[in-house]
């Protein structure tokens, strides 16, 4: 009878200790996966920001060049002001 009681106590002790360690292992694995996912998202965001910045810089340069050429061609093709 005592052996059955000790067996039940030992089984209960084992059952309470192991699920806690399994949960801790799962949590640590999930947290490492979360940090990897966060890192990938950060790198992706930086990449898209760099692409946007590069394209925006090209657009600004193109607009500045168009404005400069328009000012040069406009001064060249406009008729001289009438003399009075």
From Swiss-Prot:
Recorded superkingdom: Eukaryota
GO biological process: regulation of blood pressure
Pfam family, one: Hormone_2
Subcellular location: Secreted
Principal subcellular localisation of the protein: secreted
SMART domains on file: GLUCA (SM00070)
Molecular function (Gene Ontology), one example: toxin activity
Signal sequence extent: 1-23
Gene Ontology, cellular component aspect: extracellular region
Known tissue expression: Expressed by the venom gland. Not expressed in the pancreas, liver, stomach, small intestine, lung, heart, kidney, spleen, ovary, and brain.
PTM comment: An amidated Pro-81 is described. Such an amidation is however not compatible with the sequence displayed. Indeed cDNAs do not encode a Gly that could serve as substrate for peptide alpha-amidation.
Keywords: Cleavage on pair of basic residues, G-protein coupled receptor impairing toxin, Hypotensive agent, Secreted, Signal, Toxin
Propeptide: 24-44
Keyword check for Zinc: no
Family (UniProt): Belongs to the glucagon family.
Function comment: Has vasoactive intestinal peptide(VIP)/secretin-like biological activity. Interacts with rat and human VIP receptors 1 (VIPR1) and 2 (VIPR2), with the highest affinity for the human VIPR2. Induces hypotension that is mediated by relaxation of cardiac smooth muscle. This vasodilation may not be transduced by VIP or PACAP receptors.
Protein name, per record: Exendin-2-long
Organism: Heloderma suspectum (Gila monster)
Lineage: Eukaryota, Metazoa, Chordata, Craniata, Vertebrata
